[in-house]
Structure formats: C-alpha cells, structure tokens
C-alpha cells in the first residue's frame, strides 16, 4: 500500500476506520480488550501473551478517544496487518492479534517494507520524559550527584518583583502547551521537563530503599545543615551559654564546678563589711552585751534572795541522785521524813524560813 498525495488523511476500509499519517505509516483502529484475559490466537501467529505488557496512550485526533499503542521496545507485526486490509488474512475473517512476536523478536527492527512505518516509529520524534532500564542488582543503579540534588531541592526563592517589567502588568512565568487550529500535532510552546529514569529489578528491594533515600536526601541535609542547625539551637545547661553539651560527663562536671567556684570567689571579693548604722536600736545592743556576759555570771531571785551559778549546778545534781538497789528491806520501814531530810533538793532558806522536819 503506497501512499499517494491525493488520498485524504482519513478513509474507511471494509467499514473499519483507520488513520494514515502524512509520512505513509498505517495506524490500526482502536479496540477494546481485557489485559487479564488471554486473547485467541490463530495457528499462523507465533506470539505469546504477556499480562505485564505495558501500553501507552496518546491522542491522535481531537474527535476520537485515546487509543493504546505499544512500547517503543516492541513493534507491530506489519505483515499480518497488511494481509488483513488486503484480504489475505485468516479464514474466519477475524481481526488478527496486535501483540508482538516474541519468538522472532530479533527481526523486529528489520523493515521489509520501507514505505511502511510502525506505530512506535510514528511517535519516535515525540518527547519522552520516562525511561526504563533493566538492571541485575541494585549496585548498578546510578544515583544523581549531590549538586543535582541540591539544585533540585534547595533552590533559592524566586524574586517575583525583580522579574516584573517596568509596566504594571506582571509577565507570565510559565507557558502552557497550546495547539494550532490547523494542525493538532504541532505544539507552539513546550515546557522543559526533567527525564525520570525508572530502574527495573528482577527481585523486589525491601530495606535498601531506605538506604538509597538517605544517600540522596537525608545524608545531604545532615552534611549541609546539621552543623548550622545545632549552632543556632545549642543544648545548654540551665541558662549558662558558656556550657554546652558537647563533651563527656566528667568534663561537664569539672567545668560546672570550676565555674561555680569562680563565681563564689567573685562574690566574696565584691562583698564589703556592713557598717553599724547610727540609728540602731539601743535595746538590741544591750541584748547583745548581755548574751556575751551570760557565760560569766548572772543573777536569779527567788523570794528576793540572790543565787549564784554554783547553786544552780547543785540543784541540777540533786535531781540526778538515784536510790541504790542494795538497800535492805529494813530501810523500807524508815519514814519518809528521814529520807527527805537526808535527800533535800532545795535548801531550807529557799523553801521556808523553818527547816524541814
């Protein structure tokens, strides 16, 4: 099927819609299928169905819904598609399968018809922001550099007032992609995007994912901003800014003791003796003088009679006199008056003028 310039971009063959690109490539019509159900394949097709096959959707016409296409790795079996539209298909006139021929995957890049182009080749010029790479182990994964991560996550804030022009209207910071009215495949504005690379491993990764994230983000934060953060918010003892918890416990105790001793010496050096005020109370001074002379001598009066300190000691000793246990039973018959006469606590002059009987 060689394309001709007189053929319209869209035509109908056998009551089935198909699209022909300007470059001559043939695109099959959209179909509805279930990925979880294996399709029915004829004996002429040597293909196997892969439930993990990846599909990508792209808009071909604004009036049609999104149609699936295969990944750029796989291509459509072009010979079977030609037989379908030229009448050389299977006997049951059913549409053949569009799945790839896995057994003949080595010859998929060979194009026997140079004027025919596959679906993936039609969209090869479109921008691809996702890449998939298969690796055998996690050690083969290439991590971005620290400078790239720093520019991505730690960028400086944008000065919006600096980007404004001299007029009062602010310029647009981003331009959304638009399409022309004549050709829907041409984009006027394309936004810059970073390419995201996805690595496919044969076995799942469990604990190493956390290590990878730490190497990229957390490690960078700890190296760049941990010292500044701790410097701005130091851990201190009480409110003393000179002592910080950056040493061992013994060193901290020594530093704290030396600091307290120095403070005490400074307070003692700054302290001055207190002078007696001229307006002090005379009674307080008299009480102080009496307390100093109390140990030497003092006077106590009982019924107008004076007593010395020796008399008081004699009175105290008389209270501590105890009766011995060696007294016989005959002594118990003595009268109370005789024992009281022998063991007088106070002298007769103090108790009464008459002596005790």
From Swiss-Prot:
Region of interest (Disordered), residue spans: 79-98, 264-290, 323-357
Presence of keyword Phosphoprotein: yes
Ranges of Acidic residues composition bias in the record: 324-335
Keywords: Phosphoprotein
Residue(s) carrying Phosphoserine: 72
GO cellular component, one term: cytoplasm
Name of protein: Uncharacterized protein YML119W
Annotated source species: Saccharomyces cerevisiae (strain ATCC 204508 / S288c)
Lineage: Eukaryota, Fungi, Dikarya, Ascomycota, Saccharomycotina
């Amino acid at each position: 099927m060689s394309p001709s310039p007189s053929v319209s971009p869209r035509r109908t063959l056998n009551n089935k819609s198909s699209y022909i690109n300007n470059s001559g490539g043939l695109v099959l019509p959209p179909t509805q299928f279930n990925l979880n159900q294996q399709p029915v394949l004829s004996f002429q097709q040597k293909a196997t169905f892969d439930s993990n096959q990846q599909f990508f959707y792209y808009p071909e016409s604004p009036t049609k819904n999104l149609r699936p296409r295969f990944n750029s790795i796989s291509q459509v079996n072009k010979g079977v598609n030609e037989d379908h539209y030229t009448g050389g298909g299977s006997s049951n006139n059913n549409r053949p399968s569009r799945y790839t021929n896995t057994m003949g995957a080595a010859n998929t890049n060979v194009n026997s018809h140079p004027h025919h182009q596959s679906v993936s080749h039609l969209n090869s010029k479109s921008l691809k922001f996702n890449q998939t790479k298969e690796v055998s182990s996690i050690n083969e994964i290439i991590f971005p550099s620290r400078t790239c991560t720093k520019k991505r996550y730690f960028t400086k804030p944008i000065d919006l007032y600096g980007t404004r022009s001299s007029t009062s209207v602010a310029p647009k910071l981003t331009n959304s992609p638009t399409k022309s009215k004549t050709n829907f495949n041409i984009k006027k504005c394309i936004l810059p995007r970073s390419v995201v690379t996805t690595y496919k491993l044969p076995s799942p990764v469990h604990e190493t994912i956390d290590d990878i994230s730490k190497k990229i983000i957390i490690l960078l934060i700890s190296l760049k901003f941990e010292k500044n953060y701790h410097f701005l918010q130091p851990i201190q003892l009480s409110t003393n800014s000179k002592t910080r918890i950056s040493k061992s416990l013994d060193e901290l105790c020594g530093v704290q003791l030396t600091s307290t001793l120095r403070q005490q010496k400074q307070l003692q050096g700054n302290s001055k003796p207190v002078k007696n005020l001229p307006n002090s109370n005379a009674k307080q001074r008299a009480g102080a003088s009496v307390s100093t002379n109390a140990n030497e001598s003092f006077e106590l009066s009982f019924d107008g009679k004076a007593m010395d300190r020796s008399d008081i000691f004699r009175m105290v000793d008389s209270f501590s006199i105890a009766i011995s246990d060696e007294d016989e039973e005959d002594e118990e018959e003595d009268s109370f008056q005789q024992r009281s006469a022998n063991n007088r606590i106070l002298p007769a002059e103090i108790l009464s003028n008459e002596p005790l009987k």
